[in-house]
Swiss-Prot record:
The gene is atpI. GO terms for cellular component: plasma membrane; proton-transporting V-type ATPase, V0 domain; vacuolar proton-transporting V-type ATPase complex. GO terms for biological process: vacuolar acidification. Its main location: membrane. It is found in: Cell membrane. Belongs to the V-ATPase 116 kDa subunit family. Signal peptide: none annotated. This is V-type ATP synthase subunit I. Pfam families: V_ATPase_I_N. The chain crosses the membrane at residues 353-373, 412-432, 484-504, 518-538, 550-570, 587-607, 621-641. Produces ATP from ADP in the presence of a proton gradient across the membrane. The keyword Transmembrane applies. GO terms for molecular function: ATPase binding; proton-transporting ATPase activity, rotational mechanism.
Amino acid sequence: MISPMQQVVIAVRKRESDNVITALQDAGVLHLRPIAEGPLSTGNLAGQDAQERREDERLLARAESTIAELGAYRPAPAPLPAQSEWETVVEGAAQPVSHLAKRRQELQSDLEVDRTYGDAVRALARMVGTLDRSRRVALVPFLIGATENLGELDGALRESLGDRYTVASEVVGANRVGVIATLSADRDAARAALSKARLGELRLPGRFDTMPLGAAADELGRVRQGGDDMQRALNAERDRLAQQHGPALYAVRDALKDRVAVHDVRAVSARGKYSLAMQGYVPADRIPALQSTLSRFGDAVSYEVFPVDEHHDQDVPVELKNSGYVTPFQNTVMGLMSLPKYGSFDPTWVVALFVPLFFGIIMADIGYGLLFLAFGMWLLGKARRNEGWDLSLFGAYLPPATLRDLGFVTNVMAGWTILWGFLTGEFFGTLFEHLGVFYMNNDLLNRLWGWTGVHWGAHAAEGGHSTGLLPIVFPRLDTENFGNIALVFALCFGILQVLWGWGIRVQQGLKHNDQAHVWEGLAMFGGVGALILLGFISKAGADFGALSNFGDWRVLLMILGFVLFIVGYLRVAKQFPLLPVELVSQGGSVVSYARIFAVGLVSAILAKLCTDLGWSLSQQIGFLGIILGIVIGALLHFFVLALTLIGHILQPIRLHMVEFLNPTGFNNETSPRYAPLRRLSPASDAGQVK
């Protein structure tokens, strides 16, 4: 649900404003809204206030850049030094850290030069010998393809220099490196000849550019030989500095952020000569905390709390407040979506119910479900040990709280996958069918699904694996008999959610007294429902004559739906002239849910192929075939799962983001996230802004 908000206006004496703002930081409940106009000063600070803000921001930037250069995660909390020592603490860490960062950068640059040019420079040094120390001889190195001819270069040099040059070359890796030796006075002519031959001079980057080739080769040799050890030593030095300065740096950084936040509050408030006024929003259940905070200041503070007008107030922040089962989905899956508009519909619980259900229908494999369950339990184990997950390959770090939510969501999805795996009879594809655990019971299938007009053969042998322990009740791999049933089953979710979405549109329109959206929702609800009935009555276009059977209640309901669409469209034609086009589009939205069947069937077929290949090897080659079958089958399953898993996760999320939430109006408007003013540093140690 969306937490109900209350709007707050606070007026405070200017001399008490710093203490009040600091107390509001401690309370951590007020979401500030800028005051943009009025008789009092608003906007950027000026004078002494602006100077103090610039100084605090400068020191904060210095602290944050130092922490970034240290590459340290937040350590355990440390005491905050006295405010007078903050600059000393920051500069005391920044100077050695910046010097170390410069050395690390230079070493990294040298290692990169050696990786790129090292072999070529050593080859050039061998070719020129001691000529690179001669004052009379100029050396012009160059690079050319290993298979290219030097004839064009030789012709250009002979034309420019006559016989006052020599060229040597050597193949190095995929290229050929060469050098022109000529008189110092002819250096520019040799370079011009290189350009004429469409070649460029080989110039080394950085400090190596001015070195003789022999000296550069020796230096790059030292870099190659000792570079890794030097890098480890520098990294160890960085770790030592992080342990030495990190705790105090983080403490000062947090305190500086709090001070800058105080300046920010001033900037978004209305300022007079003797007073300061601010406005914002507080969740209704946290009003007592705000009142308790402000009551300590007596008559130095005056405030008023009044309800938010959810129909007309703009920029009211949103805080989603769900509990129990829904919360992990709010913190993970809903993070991929925008926030709902304040006063509208919170779809978190719908997502929490249907996304794992759809994922389970798509995967529907006990083996895969057990793998997901193991992964989810591993995530929960790390969270219980208060360990994070460093995904440095992706430049991310997942804290324990995030792992706890991800582990819960993964386990729910695994549970649905295992449940549907029992219904489809799939364990890593058809492995349990081969082992005689699952089997096709035609009599049972006829009793379950015969009402649809589908009939499985009277003899059990016609059903494939005819004996076993557990019967298959949702045989999606039997596409000949069950394909249409599975497809319609998937489309039923589309019918439910698309109509539900337009029903929410009507409900929200009534709630906000928005007649245009009420009639739009009614028109689309009736039109989409009529299209669905048209498809069922005509059997997907195979029997249009049934549409004229007015004795069928479904035909009358279909006509009522089209009438409702026409009436609704006439009421909102000016606002929504393309509503008939949208109606066709919404029919497509219902059909989009067929991907639950289609993607799931592809997943099942791929898993079946992987298992059948491994099983056939085990049957044909004997004991060695069993080993090969297990290894090859496992590798193929891993490969298929790695290629398709992301798509299987995203498909249910997409269905909710587009097909379900578009009709509700969820994607049309959003509200800012509730971000209350909070303190980062300990309340007792924070310095006051003067």
